[in-house]
Design a protein with these regions (language model features):
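Short beta-strand/loop motif that positions the catalytic acidic residue
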Residues: 146, 152-154
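Conserved alpha/beta-hydrolase catalytic His-Asp/Glu region
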Residues: 73-77, 88-142
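Conserved alpha/beta-hydrolase "acid-adjacent" motif
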Residues: 159-165
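Flexible "cap/lid" loop of the alpha/beta hydrolase fold
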Residues: 51-54, 58-90
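Catalytic histidine-centered segment of alpha/beta-hydrolase-like enzymes
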Residues: 183-192, 196
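Conserved HGGG/HGGXW glycine-rich cap/lid loop of the alpha/beta-hydrolase fold
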Residues: 1-33
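Catalytic histidine neighborhood in serine/cysteine hydrolases
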Residues: 170-186
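Gly/Ala-rich beta-loop-alpha elbow adjacent to hydrolase catalytic centers
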Residues: 41-45, 49
């Protein structure tokens, strides 16, 4: 049976993937398995998935959702932005923090309920600081090294990441693009049925043949 290694985004939980009703493992983002069937990464998890693949992780397929290719300009500005959020995740009032986080334009008004008790706030702040896109090296120049099939997904209302997705599939040797019409950044949870169907279709189309018939 196909096993999906699913990497959630920032402020994500392993249970975020329960809706898929597929054989899914959702590891800690610091302990990504080095091999498997399909590697699925959303947002921050998508960036970490790309770096894992470029670092030699062995998977048959990959699905990247709402992920960027890295910050090539204005890195100091992005670092300052991430530090601002890190300070708030460490010390800010939770309700106001969640309201402001979900009000960011990329989310298109879609909010995911999050309870403070589910998180270590110092760990969230550390993730923002250590995994800032301004610190991780940009990957565009190395995407040609990822030879496995890749499905890259973005929501049509998430203009920045649609542009990143289109650029990525031009650079990858074996990639498909799905723009989820009407969705913003959180495609899997805005359109769970369509997302799960597209994921199943991609995996099924890439399964190695098990036929023993003679040619």
């Amino acid at each position: 049976m196909e096993v999906i290694t699913a990497l959630h985004g920032f402020l994500g939980l392993p249970s975020d993937w329960d809706f898929l009703r597929m054989d899914v493992i959702a590891p800690d983002l610091r302990d990504i398995p080095r091999e498997g069937d399909t590697l699925l990464g959303y947002s921050l998890g998508g960036r970490l998935a790309l770096h894992a693949l470029l670092d030699g992780a062995r998977y048959r397929n990959a699905v990247i959702v709402s992920a960027g290719l890295g910050v090539e300009e204005d890195r100091d500005a992005r670092l300052a932005q991430d530090e601002h959020w890190a300070e708030r995740f460490e010390h800010g009032e939770w309700y106001t923090l969640m309201r402001d986080w979900n009000a960011q334009p990329i989310f298109g008004g879609h909010a995911m309920p999050r309870h403070e008790s589910d998180f270590d706030r110092r760990e969230l702040a550390r993730q923002l600081r250590e995994w800032s896109p301004a610190l991780l090296p940009p990957v565009a120049a190395r995407l040609h090294e990822i030879e496995i099939p890749v499905l890259w997904i973005a929501g049509s209302r998430d203009a920045k990441y649609v542009a990143e997705a289109r650029r990525a599939v031009e650079l990858l040797p074996n990639a498909e693009l799905w723009i989820a019409e009407g969705a913003a950044h959180r495609v899997p949870w805005e359109q769970p049925e369509a997302f799960a169907a597209r994921l199943r279709e991609f995996i099924a189309s890439r399964k190695p043949s098990t036929s023993n018939d003679a040619p």
